[in-house]
Amino acid sequence: MNSTKKLTAIFTAAFLSSGIFVSNVNAAPKPTAKPVANNGEVQITCKPTKATGHREKKVGTPKLQKFSKNRVITLNTNCGEIVIEAFAKKAPVTVSMLSGLVTSKFYDQSICHRLIYSQSAALLQCGDPTASGYGGPQFQFNDENLPKAAMNNYPAGTVAMANSGPNTNGSQFFIMAANTTLDPYYTVWGRVTKGLEIVQAVVANGTATGEEVGQPKVKIAIEKVSIR
């Protein structure tokens, strides 16, 4: 984007899906159900950003931490602030790894490179500095805190790790823009407490090509991340 852009989107809030593979493989989900609710009008403002795909910063495997309470991760994006409550007690390994990536500035100036917006699912995927869908740190870690529910197990606002198979978590994660049912293969590590409307508006504006899966039409970049 070359100038500040205001987005107004009518966003469908609830979806159902089955067997969606959310990872660095650009495989589109198969629609299995129609939208069942409407959330109304969403408006956000996105500023110009110089962020672009780049080589990942080399980061060693972070040390495991012991947490007495949840952490708060704030994504400062060109479209506004997204605040995430990180489930440090339910997903201590994941939050430890993310803490290391955040403090190492691994995510700074990275683009949210992929979205899905279909009758099956609505999500925004981020966390790959290369913006190719194949980037990540030099380490991987195991799954944890997988959902037990069979339906609507990834509600709107859920933040979970993307992967390429069991126990292959790295840095990429996705934020659910609508209530969705997925196979329970993706570590849930947080929920958005502020700024979900940003994700919803970006997702509702679709992909650059107009297809259900691909690079967002609206460029959204994580310019800086903090954790406390």
Model-derived segments and spans:
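Bacterial N-terminal signal peptides that target proteins for export
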Residues: 1-11
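Compositionally biased regions
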Residues: 3-4, 18-20, 24
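Bacterial N-terminal signal peptides
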Residues: 11-19
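Cyclophilin-like peptidyl-prolyl cis-trans isomerases
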Residues: 22-228
